[in-house]
Amino acid sequence: YDLDSAALGFETRWNYQGTAALIQPFVQWKWRISDQMDFTAGVHAQYFTLTNSVSPFEPRLGWKYKMGNGQAISAGGGLHSMIQPYYTYAYQYLDGKPGNMNMDFSRSAHSGIGYEKSFNKGFNIKTEAYYQYLYNIPVTIAPSSFSMINVGSGFSRLFIDSLQNTGDGYNYGLELTIQKYFDKSFFFLFSGTVYNSQYRGSDSIWRNTSYNGNYVVNFLGGKEFKVGERSVIGIGGKVTAAGGKRYGLVDIETSTAMKEIIFQDSMFNDLQFPDYFRADLKISWRKNDDRV
């Protein structure tokens, strides 16, 4: 807190100083069973010094089989864990002591299967189906819709109370990628995903996560035209479309008292902003010269 912050109406919410380290040992082994089949296995672990959180054993497996004629199938799965945003550990009680030093890692189990087909002239198609179960997610002790699974979906920081690792959630979806590598002065890349993302806070109600737009589509392409002996004109474009971000109704009275945005638990993330759409066009000119 200083003269500049006082003039702007800012005040110190938390003031904490400390050090932390995240240690992540891992071992990975790849076995080429045959010319058509590969198998990858690994074990990951991590230790967070700030809270003494330990994840001693996170196995991860991957398998791929080439069926010939440019086709391949794959499958994989594994356990993962991650720390929380650093500032959330520094929540302070009225006596100044940090109140979230008992927070553990968020954890997840991932699985997926895929298929790909390569054609002549640099053209290929890939598709993948996946499922992720998220658990050990920090949520409030008192029943509410809050979950750390949604933190990071916006630009504001959340000054939450003490948290416990009892929340969970899941994601599942289907991805499709169609790609043509640059050949004969032309390329394109299409990727599309349809998915569902749900979570459960300490009130045990399933809700949309803030990221649950349900679909994302991207298209990128370009073409070059030779002009004369030394010049090239390029035309390219990119189109992105995605489902709108989820949101809820603001609790105006509580937000005013707390001096930050507090959402109502009822209907949280039931509402959705309009879908996102963006299109970009690029035109370029390139000239090759012996002196350049």
Residue positions per predicted region:
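Outer membrane beta-barrel strand-and-loop segments of large Gram-negative receptors
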Residues: 13-24, 100, 104, 124-187
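Repeated loop/turn-to-beta-strand initiation elements of outer-membrane beta-barrel proteins
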Residues: 36-39, 70-73, 121-125, 184-188, ...
